[in-house]
Amino acid sequence: MSDEFVIKPESVSPSSNTSEWPLLLKDYDKLLVRSGHYTPIPAGASPLKRDLKSYISSGVINLDKPSNPSSHEVVAWIKRILRCEKTGHSGTLDPKVTGCLIVCVDRATRLVKSQQGAGKEYVCIVRLHDALKDEKELGRGLENLTGALFQRPPLISAVKRQLRVRTIYDSNLIEFDNKRNLGVFWASCEAGTYMRTLCVHLGMLLGVGGHMQELRRVRSGALSENDNLVTLHDVMDAQWVYDNTRDESYLRKIIQPLETLLVGYKRIVVKDSAVNAVCYGAKLMIPGLLRYEEGIELYDEVVLITTKGEAIAVAIAQMSTVDLATCDHGVVAKVKRCIMERDLYPRRWGLGPIAQKKKQMKADGKLDKYGRANENTPETWKKTYVSLENAEPTTAPASKSEEKPLIKEVEKKEVEQKEESKEESKTPEEKKDKKEKKEKKDKKEKKEKKEKKEKKRKADDDESSEKKKKKSKK
């Protein structure tokens, strides 16, 4: 056999270039490894290889909003064109404003809130009401209007006209024509900033007055106008092509997976067996962790992903990267907003020995349907099984001063238990006498309270009548 058909042994393994992997799997080999062992489950699919129905229902469209229709109208049109159940957008644009409007479809609408709060970028044309003495004044005025600014919504707005603080992160003057009193500038700002108000403030600062002539949004959150921007006509044409020729390539081109909005988040990779538990709202624990990113701090927003690159949920980190590397147990992250549908992956909880025994005892009637003890429950189970459902997390007392109240509480409980045992040992006649005494005592207390109220009311009436007499004498 010739040498060209033989695979020769090598000491170096071929490197896979993960920088070209799609979406949330990019630079996967640079993630820190917690565990290399897990059982792959064939459920789920890579975001770009989902079947068309689930691809559309977990997709986002970076739409170039036309001038004149409102954002809600545009979103309603897309809902009608794609024949989907739900649509939402990443932040309202005024009717005359054009540019990036991220339209989320069905399952992706769960990310709308996070995109509405993300930063925005605009290109704006401002018309000044008079010529400037020095053309450089406009650039200097824009520089002054960066940072935290007070803004009141314009006269015609959909919200209450309250004074609010909004931040302008950066701004650049692109062009200025002093003869025509028109300036074009770019601004990066916080969500909820009114560019119309900014233009009015700019005119006031320059001493000539001004207003906004035209506006275009060039970035909204994670997507800019360079990231696969499509028009309403593109959406309509793609749906028409699919309906008439069954060619889904155009629909796949205009719709992007929802994972594109989460590329900026720190990632935590979850084992396939833990995915469905997280979808049902469980906290992610250390045993369910596969890989995690550098630089995660406590209470950071992170995205939980599967080994196929699907987003499971947006979560709040309960451990930093350092803790994740060293801890052998504990909560990694709490779910803030679940994205994935339940039961896409199979259930993999309740398979331990105690859980299986509990299941069997429920079936035999030795426990009730909630897993609580009943009259048929064996004594050994009652003594050995510890329910953690209502147990509060116990921490070691920091000092002796904290120990004392705990001891007192234990003593108090012991006394209560003794009293209860005494109560049980009493005869029915003794119990009846005690009940009657208690009722008499309660009646007496009520009577005393009523008398006190009456006395107070009479005293108040006497005071008011005296005051009236004094006034009449004057």
Swiss-Prot record:
Its main location: nucleus. The active site is at D94 (nucleophile). GO terms for molecular function: DNA binding; RNA binding; snRNA pseudouridine synthase activity. Keywords: DNA-binding, Isomerase, Microtubule, Nucleus, Repeat, Ribonucleoprotein, Ribosome biogenesis, RNA-binding, rRNA processing. Residues 361-372, 400-433 have a biased composition (Basic and acidic residues). It catalyses: uridine in 5S rRNA = pseudouridine in 5S rRNA; uridine in snRNA = pseudouridine in snRNA; a uridine in mRNA = a pseudouridine in mRNA. It is an enzyme of class 5 (isomerase). Its EC number is 5.4.99.-. It is found in: Nucleus, Nucleolus. GO terms for cellular component: box H/ACA snoRNP complex; microtubule. Residues 265-340 form the PUA domain. SUPFAM superfamilies: Pseudouridine synthase (SSF55120), PUA domain-like (SSF88697). Residues 434-456 have a biased composition (Basic residues). Residues 431-460 are annotated as: 9 X 3 AA tandem repeats of K-K-[DE]. Sequence repeats lie at residues 431-433, 434-436, 437-439, 440-442, 443-445, 446-448, 449-451, 452-454, 455-457. GO terms for biological process: box H/ACA sno(s)RNA 3'-end processing; mRNA pseudouridine synthesis; rRNA pseudouridine synthesis; snRNA pseudouridine synthesis. The keyword DNA-binding applies. Residues 356-375, 390-474 are annotated as: Disordered. Belongs to the pseudouridine synthase TruB family. Catalytic subunit of H/ACA small nucleolar ribonucleoprotein (H/ACA snoRNP) complex, which catalyzes pseudouridylation of rRNA. This involves the isomerization of uridine such that the ribose is subsequently attached to C5, instead of the normal N1. Pseudouridine ('psi') residues may serve to stabilize the conformation of rRNAs and play a central role in ribosomal RNA processing. The H/ACA snoRNP complex also mediates pseudouridylation of other types of RNAs. Catalyzes pseudouridylation at position 93 in U2 snRNA. Component of the small nucleolar ribonucleoprotein particles containing H/ACA-type snoRNAs (H/ACA snoRNPs). This is H/ACA ribonucleoprotein complex subunit CBF5. It comes from Kluyveromyces lactis (strain ATCC 8585 / CBS 2359 / DSM 70799 / NBRC 1267 / NRRL Y-1140 / WM37). The lineage of its organism: Eukaryota, Fungi, Dikarya, Ascomycota, Saccharomycotina.
